């Protein structure tokens, strides 16, 4: 994982890097040529209005919280008719970032809360690609993820 000194250099000189912003208010920049490690700066005031923040990923990852705090809510997803429990929700596959958009037709599902986890500076957590979750960062939280393909 990248050193804290290197992260501090990036934060002190942010215009030396290419950044993109996710619809839920997370700035990101890749830290290596292979795009395995990524730095995130969270600011939900930059989120797109009415954006859904419940999502999964196309890869597994481990996240290290450097500054601020993250609450992570995991969910179980059930196809309609499998279960009467949970909250009705609409699911669709999307591509995030520049040039992103819908990749599949939306479908009705149900989601059930699996509990909330809380993390602070120095903490790590891991997610498998298909795990549905929602992140609640403190404003200005800084994290580094390491992706596994």
Question: Model-derived features: where do they sit?
Answer:
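A short, N-terminal "cap"/entry segment at the start of jelly-roll beta-barrel domains
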Residues: 1-41
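Conserved hydrophobic/aromatic beta-strand scaffold that supports enzyme active sites
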Residues: 28, 39-41, 116-118, 124-126, ...
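Fe(II)/2-oxoglutarate oxygenase catalytic core
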Residues: 34, 49-51, 65, 70
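Conserved short histidine dyad/triad with adjacent acidic residue
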Residues: 39-56, 73-79, 129
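Short, conserved beta-strand element in jelly-roll/cupin
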Residues: 58-72, 76
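Short acidic-glycine-tyrosine-enriched beta hairpin
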Residues: 76-131
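Exposed beta-sheet edge/beta-hairpin loop segments within beta-rich domains
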Residues: 134-138
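A short hydrophobic beta-strand segment most commonly corresponding to one strand
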Residues: 139-149
């Amino acid at each position: 994982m990248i050193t804290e000194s290197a992260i501090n250099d990036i934060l002190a000189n942010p215009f030396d890097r290419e950044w993109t912003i996710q619809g839920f208010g997370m700035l990101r920049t890749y830290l290596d040529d292979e795009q395995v490690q990524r730095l995130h700066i969270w600011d939900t005031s930059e989120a797109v209005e009415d954006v859904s923040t419940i999502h999964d990923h196309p890869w597994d990852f481990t996240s290290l919280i450097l500054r601020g705090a993250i609450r992570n809510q995991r969910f179980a997803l059930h196809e309609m008719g499998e279960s009467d429990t949970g909250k009705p929700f609409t699911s669709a596959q999307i591509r995030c970032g520049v040039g992103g958009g819908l990749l599949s037709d939306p479908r009705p599902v149900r989601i059930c809360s699996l509990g909330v986890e809380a993390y602070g500076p120095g903490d790590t957590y891991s997610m498998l690609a298909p795990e549905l979750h929602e992140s609640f960062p403190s404003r200005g939280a800084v994290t580094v993820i390491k992706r596994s393909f």
